[in-house]
Curated annotation (Swiss-Prot):
It is found in: Membrane. Promotes the growth of epithelial cells. This is Epigen. The chain crosses the membrane at residues 109-129. Disulfide bonds join C58-C71, C66-C82, C84-C93. Residues 54-94 form the EGF-like domain. It comes from the Eukaryota.
Length: 151
């Protein structure tokens, strides 16, 4: 019963989050589109680069062409193109750009060297203590220990 309740709560939370994300993405795309195509007047186009002059809003049939971005119709190419949201790339903004972190190889070698040094020191210390303890047990006035002769 408790497990079923937990699953129910998790599913409700996931549903609420997905609805909120959909609302945020649609409002974000509207804001981006509005800032991208501010004005359609000739004066505005005269100040814009040539590429932006060739772009128009997508037709209704291409409305869902871009997966994670904004759709624009290129008049010379006569095909829809996408302006991807941050973190996405590809022709239809279908690929998520993953962050990669390269570790400096010298740091790794130093860490491995220190680890091996500590391990070797520990093993040598254990061997030294074992031999010394053994030598003390065997040492008597009449016995030889570690090459020493008795008095």
């Amino acid at each position: 019963m408790a497990f079923g309740m937990l699953i129910y709560i998790l599913l409700k939370a996931m549903g609420a989050l997905s609805e909120e994300a959909a609302l945020t993405a649609s409002s974000l795309s509207t804001e981006l589109w509005n800032s991208w195509t501010k004005n359609n007047t000739e004066a505005y186009y005269a100040e814009q680069p040539r590429l932006l002059k060739l772009m128009q809003t997508c037709l209704e049939e291409h409305h869902s062409y871009c997966i994670n971005g904004l759709c624009a119709f290129h008049s010379e190419l006569r095909k829809p193109i996408c302006k991807c949201l941050a973190g996405y790339n590809g022709e239809r903004c279908e690929h998520l750009t993953l962050n990669s972190y390269a570790h400096n190889s010298y740091e790794r070698y130093i860490a491995v060297g220190i680890g091996i040094g500590i391990l070797t020191s520990g093993i040598l210390a254990i061997i030294y203590c074992y031999v010394r303890k053994r030598c003390r047990k065997l040492k008597s006035p009449y016995k030889v220990c570690m090459g020493e002769t008795a008095l």
